[in-house]
């Protein structure tokens, strides 16, 4: 991970970082994110460049170093561009619709599943079988998309279910009759 940690993060225009006792706040055009990092890791901001340093070369510090740099970079990308996960639904009668900030899913159950959007995450339904999960925090966007997918994950025989756009679902052959 140390190779990732040694890379410098370049700040895009309109993004500023405030570091106070390793509680980092990143402000940008799309919003503001705050996160606390390990106190042993040094985060220095010089103009439009951010560097992450570690005190020694122990295995633990190397891993924390790379993870800190990756998380900080995700915060910078989130407040400047944002993150989006696209999901698609396959199956007869599988539909999604928005009711306010709630996502209502009909996925072949006796009832409809309702998913409340967590703070900082929004849903978009361009077509009844496509769902976009949008936000500035990469972690919460990914977790929300994974939760929506888990409501009806794709099954291997017909491929019905909710999947990420571009996700390959391994198919199985059905039973062969005698």
Curated annotation (Swiss-Prot):
PANTHER family on file: 60S/50S RIBOSOMAL PROTEIN L6/L9 (PTHR11655), LARGE RIBOSOMAL SUBUNIT PROTEIN UL6M (PTHR11655:SF14)
One Gene Ontology term, aspect cellular component: cytosolic large ribosomal subunit
HAMAP family given in the database record: Ribosomal_uL6_B
Keywords (A to Z) from UniProt: Ribonucleoprotein, Ribosomal protein, RNA-binding, rRNA-binding
Protein name as catalogued: Large ribosomal subunit protein uL6
Function: This protein binds to the 23S rRNA, and is important in its secondary structure. It is located near the subunit interface in the base of the L7/L12 stalk, and near the tRNA binding site of the peptidyltransferase center.
Subunit structure: Part of the 50S ribosomal subunit.
Keyword set includes Transmembrane: no
Gene expressing this chain: rplF
GO molecular function (one): rRNA binding
GO biological process assignments: cytoplasmic translation
Homology family: Belongs to the universal ribosomal protein uL6 family.
